[in-house]
Amino acid sequence: MAKVSKRMKEISAKINAEKKYPVSEAFDLLREVSSVKFVESVDVSVALGVDPRKSDQVVRGASVLPNGTGKTVRVAVFAKGPAADAAKEAGAEVVGMEDLADEVKKGNMDFDVVIASPDSMRVVGQLGQILGPKGLMPNPKVGTVTMDVAKAVRDAKAGQVRYRVDKAGIIHTTIGKVNFTSDALKQNLEQLLTDLKKAKPAVSKGIYLKKVSVSSTMGPGINVDFSDLNI
């Protein structure tokens, strides 16, 4: 415990919780306080000016990060015929219909994203209690129920992140790894914030993007001054 306490004291001495850091400085600081032996993810939290208790203010969607997330993404697709062929060609690891549903029911789910063509939802709909709790249930609002399954596969492979506002009005997602360059992380953050602005509910009034903070997997949050970003 003493080691953890010492580390936290050192980190606290380097980070001013009241300060909003310029983006590049925030990423440099994030790397500086990272002391674990694995390559941490860079996570971002965005506080939005919405009331998620109201259905017309629930912000959800997806963003394709220009520099990816640094993660290898395995994709499963529910489709048949030409759509299934297109999904395989796009790089999907698993493609099927009833046979894939049977594997899911057995607990064989070696994939990170599930995509479905609209005509496959009669099969996928039966898997809600299995896929839903794992955050894998396809949904048209985030582009995982689509006629163009090949594009959805390519987007997922390229580093698409999905987001949904939580009960506190905050979006949590990842924008890369600590070994990304600051420019790459900045571009990813800009893309995410741009997409969040596009997803602003019409009924949302006042300041929409209220606060942005970044952190590594095991690190503390660092407040970011996003006023100079290209969003």
Swiss-Prot record:
Alphabetical keyword list: Repressor, Ribonucleoprotein, Ribosomal protein, RNA-binding, rRNA-binding, Translation regulation, tRNA-binding
GO MF term (any one): structural constituent of ribosome
GO biological process, one term: translation
Pfam families in the record: Ribosomal_L1 (PF00687)
Keyword Ribonucleoprotein found: yes
Entry's Gene Ontology cellular component terms: cytosolic large ribosomal subunit
Classification via SUPFAM superfamilies: Ribosomal protein L1
Domain of life: Bacteria
Keyword field contains Cell cycle: no
Function in brief: Binds directly to 23S rRNA. The L1 stalk is quite mobile in the ribosome, and is involved in E site tRNA release.
Family: Belongs to the universal ribosomal protein uL1 family.
Description of how the protein assembles with itself and partners: Part of the 50S ribosomal subunit.
Descriptive protein name: Large ribosomal subunit protein uL1
Source organism (scientific name): Francisella tularensis subsp. tularensis (strain SCHU S4 / Schu 4)
Lineage: Bacteria, Pseudomonadati, Pseudomonadota, Gammaproteobacteria, Thiotrichales
